């Protein structure tokens, strides 16, 4: 009888590791990733602290930090190629990598350094894009389809792709193709009442899909069903942690006179993924994004910018609010000196559902606060996404970019795998 080992017990493996990461405001950065195997039981307890780089001014507003863990099966990345790869076994053709740009930081958005020939596995690059396209991009914008990291802008592959601002009336508008009117063709002298009802029903289902059901899984949920992450070919969100980074306010940095002050932000956190059974080979990626609220120095309430107020503007009449179509407004009605030609659409009465932040005039003359100062872009997508460069001026030093994180990933995986001793003692 052969003494060749053909199987292994399911034993725990400690995959704990340290991560020292740095990133920029509003960009989605991979903190860590772990390859997993079919049959694994994966659990993670991430503990650490996030710090903002030294601020030029005292701490004015907290920043929000979001941490996510996703599971992406390799089959979602490689498709039939992966199925054939596993069926062919040792005779399978190798899985080709993707190519990065020059520099050891050309794959930093993936939480890794590229190989000596500037290559990374495709499952990392495409897995990141799948996460962004399914969970972070504006629903009405096109998917990211970079074939290689080398096709990405340098700021994106170094610091991650920009995500949307936190919600406000001007950063979360309706889709650009939203209709503000709908016509129905009728006879010259009569109106088909039944046809009118049918037209209302058609309009309702079209609006539901335009605003709230942009993805197939949303439509199935509306019908009372659901689609699995596998059937929908999307990354599975295992855990999300959200917190506000506040820390402490200011430090005196001049020992002799304490005449110089700078803001300090430090926040400890814990991100825990409960035990997850891995159904097939894949990767678990943990990503983070840090954002300030979209406070703008020049923002005003719509009732100020509109100037000539109608009954519909100010009355907040429930009958009108519930039945009027979406309203097209201009940036000029929200920001002093903005062009009137820059239009976007909001729900009727939205100015009564939100309240703008206010920044007093003396702040405008000072740099160093986490506020938007330049007028918002006239391009809708640029306005929705965080303007990362806006925050460069608020930091005294960017040696560790905008924020830095020191964490330990306490990871335990139960895996069918021989022990190190068994692997050494072959046959």
Swiss-Prot record:
Recorded superkingdom: Viruses
Give me the segments passing through the membrane: none
Q: Where in the cell is it found?
A: Virion
**Which Pfam families does the record cross-reference, listed alphabetically?**
Phage_F
Give one GO term, molecular function aspect. Answer: structural molecule activity
Keyword check for Transmembrane: no
User: Per the record's keyword annotation, is rRNA processing included, yes or no?
Assistant: no
Q: Tell me, which GO biological process terms does this entry list? A: symbiont entry into host cell
Q: Gene Ontology cellular component?
A: T=1 icosahedral viral capsid
Q: Sorted alphabetically, which keywords does the UniProt record give? A: Capsid protein, T=1 icosahedral capsid protein, Viral genome ejection through host cell envelope, Viral penetration into host cytoplasm, Virion, Virus entry into host cell
Where it mainly occurs, coarsely classed, is virion
Please explain the role this protein plays, according to its UniProt record: Assembles to form an icosahedral capsid with a T=1 symmetry, about 30 nm in diameter, and consisting of 60 capsid proteins F. Upon virus binding to host cell, one of the spikes dissociates from the capsid and the virus interacts with LPS through the exposed EF loops on the F proteins. After the genome had been ejected, the channel formed by the F proteins at the unique fivefold axis remains open.
Similarity comment text for this entry: Belongs to the microviridae F protein family.
Q: How does it assemble?
A: Pentamerizes and interacts with H protein, G and B pentamers to form 12S pre-assembly complex. By binding with protein D, induces joining of twelve 12S complex to form the procapsid. The procapsid has an external scaffold made of 240 copies of protein D, 60 copies of the internally located B protein, and contains 60 copies of each of the viral structural proteins F and G. Upon genome packaging, interacts with protein J. The mature virion is composed of 60 copies each of the F, G, and J proteins, and 12 copies of the H protein.
Report the protein name in the record: Capsid protein F
Q: Which gene encodes it?
A: F
């Amino acid at each position: 009888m052969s003494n060749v080992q053909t199987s292994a017990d399911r034993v725990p493996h400690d995959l704990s590791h340290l991560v020292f990461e740095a990133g920029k405001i509003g960009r989605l950065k991979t903190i860590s990733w772990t390859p997993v195997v079919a049959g694994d039981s994966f659990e993670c307890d991430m503990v650490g602290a996030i710090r903002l780089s030294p601020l030029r001014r005292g701490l004015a507003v907290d920043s929000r930090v979001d941490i996510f863990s996703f599971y992406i099966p390799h089959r979602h990345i490689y498709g039939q190629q992966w199925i054939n790869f596993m069926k062919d076994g040792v005779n399978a053709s190798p899985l080709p990598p993707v190519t990065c740009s020059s520099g050891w930081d050309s794959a930093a958005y993936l939480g890794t350094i590229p190989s000596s020939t500037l290559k990374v596995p495709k499952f990392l690059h495409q897995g990141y894009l799948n996460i962004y396209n399914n969970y972070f991009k504006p629903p009405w914008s096109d998917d990211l389809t970079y074939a290689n990291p080398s096709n990405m802008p340098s700021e994106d592959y170094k610091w991650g792709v920009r995500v949307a601002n936190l919600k406000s009336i001007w950063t979360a508008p309706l889709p650009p193709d939203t209709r503000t009117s709908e016509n129905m063709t009728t006879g010259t002298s009569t109106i088909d009442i039944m046809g009118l009802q049918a037209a209302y029903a058609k309009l309702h289902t079209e609006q539901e899909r335009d605003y709230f059901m942009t993805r197939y899984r949303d439509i199935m949920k509306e019908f009372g069903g659901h689609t699995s992450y596998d059937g929908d070919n999307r990354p599975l969100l295992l855990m999300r942690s959200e917190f506000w980074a506040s820390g402490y306010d200011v430090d005196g940095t001049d020992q002799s006179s304490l005449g110089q002050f700078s803001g300090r932000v430090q926040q400890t956190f814990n991100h825990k993924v409960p035990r997850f059974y891995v159904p097939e080979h894949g990767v678990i990626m943990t990503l983070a994004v840090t954002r300030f609220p979209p406070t703008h120095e020049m923002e005003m309430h719509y009732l100020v910018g509109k100037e000539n107020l109608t009954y519909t503007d100010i009355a907040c009449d429930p009958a009108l609010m519930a039945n009027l179509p979406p309203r097209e407004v201009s940036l000029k009605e929200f920001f002093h000196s903005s062009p009137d030609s820059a239009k976007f659409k909001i729900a009727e009465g939205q100015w009564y559902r939100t309240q703008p932040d206010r920044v007093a005039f003396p702040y405008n003359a000072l740099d160093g606060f986490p506020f938007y100062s330049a007028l918002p872009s006239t391009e809708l997508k640029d306005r929705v996404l965080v303007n990362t460069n806006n925050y460069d001026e608020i930091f005294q030093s960017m040696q560790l970019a905008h924020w830095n994180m020191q964490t330990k990933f306490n990871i335990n995986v139960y895996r069918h795998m021989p022990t190190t001793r068994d692997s050494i003692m072959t046959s």
